[in-house]
Amino acid sequence: MTKKNQPLRIIPLGGLDGIGKNMTVVECGPDMVLIDAGLMFPDDSQPGIDLVLPDYTYVLENEEKLRGIIVTHGHEDHTGALPYLLQDLNNKVPIFSSKLTLGFIEGKLAEFRIRSPKFREVKSGSHISLGCISVDFFSMTHSIPGALGVYIKSPQGTVMHTGDFKLDQTPIDGVTPDYAAITKFAKQGVDLLLSDSTNATVPGFTKSEAEVGPTLNEVIKNAPGRVFVASFSSHIHRLQQICNAAKASGRKIVVTGRSMLTNTRVARELGYLKIDEADIIDAYDVNGIPDDKIVVMCTGSQGEAALRALAYGQRRAQDALDPLG
């Protein structure tokens, strides 16, 4: 069979049966590309299990075909399996993603002592060729900056993979989906659409993230003591609004929890999270500041939950201010 006649194969290894473990193989003859490498956090019916990984045995068995890994955005359900996969691969494979996503991945890999990964930064409008598979990237709006969708072309067909998205017309960072690029690719032809379908059966539209801001401002302004606000540590748009509300009410910001500290640092260094240095204080310095002048940003759900431990009495309030907690 000639290269031109090689079939295009799409092999989902995770992500289609729930939230988490996103990993999809795109294979064309001697070439293979992996889209995302995420993990899933266990539910209450899985005691003793810390996390769940997709079964990527097929990737390891066909490692010589793997030309690259594309990561659509920086959430754990799309990046969390990368350290484990890279440790199991014999060769360094290039990882393609946006600046912020690569920043988050770099921090995660450092925890596993994976040094000098082959990062390749891409953005909306970027084009790459990986063997007989070519990929165009376009921006998507999500709860995290730097989210990308991909348009894949091969001799045997075209695939559009949206990544996770939220059609928000007033996003916090002003970056809307690249409708022009999506329209262009649609006109070129799409043989298979792989689309985010979270809450697709729920009627109506998801409200804009910008609508959260006024409520945060009001709650934080009127709270009589310390305010603890829980969020995913990668939800940079939400964190920005928390910081804005804290500053508007004259409160200092305390960041607590390992993942929250890491992600806020990376987002600030790369310019995605705008906080004045004077508005942040170290968790060890809170005792000298009145309670009504403090906002604590902590994680609140799934495998990194600081707030859940607080709510169930598993940690004291002061312990929650341990920056390594």
State what each model feature region is.
Residues 2-70, 75-289, 306-320:
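His/Asp/Glu-rich metal-coordinating catalytic cores
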Residues 293-302:
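Conserved two-lobed SF2 helicase motor
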Residues 322-325:
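ATP-dependent carboxylate-amine ligase
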